[in-house]
Curated annotation (Swiss-Prot):
The lineage of its organism: Viruses, Duplodnaviria, Heunggongvirae, Peploviricota, Herviviricetes. Residues 98-144, 265-312 are annotated as: Disordered. Its EC number is 3.1.27.-. It is found in: Virion. The gene is UL41. The keyword Hydrolase applies. Belongs to the herpesviridae VHS protein family. This is Virion host shutoff protein.
Amino acid sequence: MGILGMRRFIREHELSVHLSIQMERGLYIPIAVDTWNVLTPIMRRLDPGNMMDPVERTLRGIMQVFSLLNKKSCFPIFVLDGGRKRAFKGPVKHDYHNIDHRAPTDGDDLEASANENQPHSLAGNAPRLASGARGAHQSSRRKTALRATPHYKLCWDLITASGFPTVYVKGMEADYGCANLFHTKTVMYVWSSDSDMVFMGCDVITDLTPAFPVAVFSKHVLEYLNMTQREFANTFVDCHTNLHSPETIYSFAAKLLEHRCGSAIDEPPAASEESSASDQQSADEDEHGAWSRYTRRPPRRADAAAWGAGPGGNGQLKGVSVLCGFPSDARPFDCAPARRRRLPQRREEPAARLKKNREFLAYMNSFIGCKVINNRHTLIKRVPIRQETFDPVEIYRILHEYAPTMANKWCAEMLVKCKLKPVPPLRDVAYGKATQINLC
């Protein structure tokens, strides 16, 4: 899920920054955690050969997440969506009363595993990907995917028993829950590698592992492109991978070129079979790869004036000290390879595409946009949050249920390495001590 090509653009134009965080003792940074988006790459790094037991791999991943959050003095709100991977889906009517924020059951665990690689559409009109040879290829990866699937019920139980707040939005995307928490000022950042968070106007921490975490600020991206948030959303909604199929989607670079030129690009570039395969591989890597992967490649400088960056594009947010500057060296625009300006392989009816885009933006705005109450008050309704007290006995019981012989060792290791302790209520952090945070 995300905006096709946005991560590549942010990497090449050096729009990500490193933050130095200095916290006073007892203060926390409220942060929303896109749980599966963060946990899955960590589990892959812990067990690249997929040889570890699924329960142990899930536990090790959770312990590493807890340890990172503790080192950075973060107060996390874990957002979970059931773990189902959905390919393309149209917008649906949103109702907060239908959000099932209760604890997931074992049925959800099995459902998530069974649907890990199966396309799903909420609107019922999305194209199916698993057909012909591609369907056979997906079925061949099924066993590996099921073995790599984390235990969602185990994750939920350990998170709640540790006393951290949770948001469970079954049947919906966790990204929208994270964006809602950010725009309601419940959290200051979102920990996720999904470019869709930047599309929704959130300040994102893409990698919390380094001593100086990597972050992307939506305000910096908008100032660099000299766009408003509304203009940015209306332009790049054509690049959303959850809304458009691979045959009808634009890349970020292609849509930006069309926006700068002021006219649509009618003909896709001609390419041989070899170049098409290279393009597809590049698109897959750009869409599914982690942001940390791009940091190993040599950066390319960009010309801010060529992209229309207005005055103040290199400014810094209050309270945050950026450890690297924004690009200033020139790079000709037309030197970008044509494969990075990916055009749709199949044209849609303009009216139908425009209608679908507007419905999706309205659906997204229902999560992060303001609503008028009683013709007087304007507010954004927050998703329901659940928080329980820290219970080490419950942690032991959970581990004993999944691994009776290793429960003592894992429980002691989890309490010591993660430095678990009673956490303050969310209200005290979000509305009290959070105002005293000093980031420099």
